[in-house]
């Protein structure tokens, strides 16, 4: 069950178990992307940083959307995890993972060693300055929806593949394959 956190002025919903002393785990869906350096190694690093992986999609290669025109192609995947972290603690973990890959935040939609985004967090809707769940741009991003549809098609909007502008997206492989 999720309850509204009235201690803040933002709309945050927290998962609570019937026994409030019990630490619960929740599932979350994470998107990963990389377009600088050894892209596969950065994706592996991020995947390895999550202890309890439930599902991992295939990896897709796409051209960048927005930002500088001279960027290299991205590798993208989506994974679902089980976590005992609350959504904001999970966000901090995602940012630490990006930092561990030497992520630099210099240009909006610019090239990056690693991008780690929380798409969904089980049973929670959050809208704050720091975090919005579900991710606000998910329905506009074929590079997220294609891998998401592999592991959680129920989370994709109806007819998304027909309504989004087609962009080139190529199946690249899986996280277990060597490239």
Predicted regions and their residues:
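Conserved small/polar residues in nucleotide/adenosyl-binding loops
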Residues: 1-6
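Compositionally biased regions
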Residues: 7-10, 18-21, 175, 179
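N-terminal beta1-alpha1 ligand-phosphate binding loop
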Residues: 12-51, 56-64
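Flexible, gly/pro- and Lys/Arg-enriched active-site loops
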Residues: 13, 57-75, 88-179
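Short beta-strand-to-loop capping motifs
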Residues: 34, 79-83, 120-123
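Hydrophobic alpha-helical segments and helix-packing faces
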Residues: 36-39, 43, 68, 72, ...
């Amino acid at each position: 069950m999720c309850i509204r956190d009235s201690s803040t002025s933002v709309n945050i919903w927290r998962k609570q178990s019937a026994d409030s002393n019990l630490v619960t785990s929740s599932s979350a869906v994470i998107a990963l992307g990389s377009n600088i350096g050894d892209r596969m190694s950065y994706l592996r690093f991020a995947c390895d940083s999550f202890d309890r992986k439930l599902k991992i999609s295939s990896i897709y290669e796409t051209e960048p959307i927005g930002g500088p025109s001279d960027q290299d192609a991205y590798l993208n995947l989506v994974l679902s995890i089980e976590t005992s972290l609350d959504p904001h603690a999970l966000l901090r973990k995602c940012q630490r993972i990006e930092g561990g890959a030497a992520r630099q935040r210099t240009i909006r939609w610019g090239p990056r060693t690693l991008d780690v985004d929380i798409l969904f967090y089980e049973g929670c809707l959050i809208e704050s300055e720091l975090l919005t769940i579900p991710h606000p741009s998910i329905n506009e991003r074929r590079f997220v929806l294609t891998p998401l549809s592999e592991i959680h098609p129920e989370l994709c909007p109806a007819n998304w593949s027909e309504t989004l502008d087609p962009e080139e997206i190529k199946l690249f492989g899986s996280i277990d394959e060597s490239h």
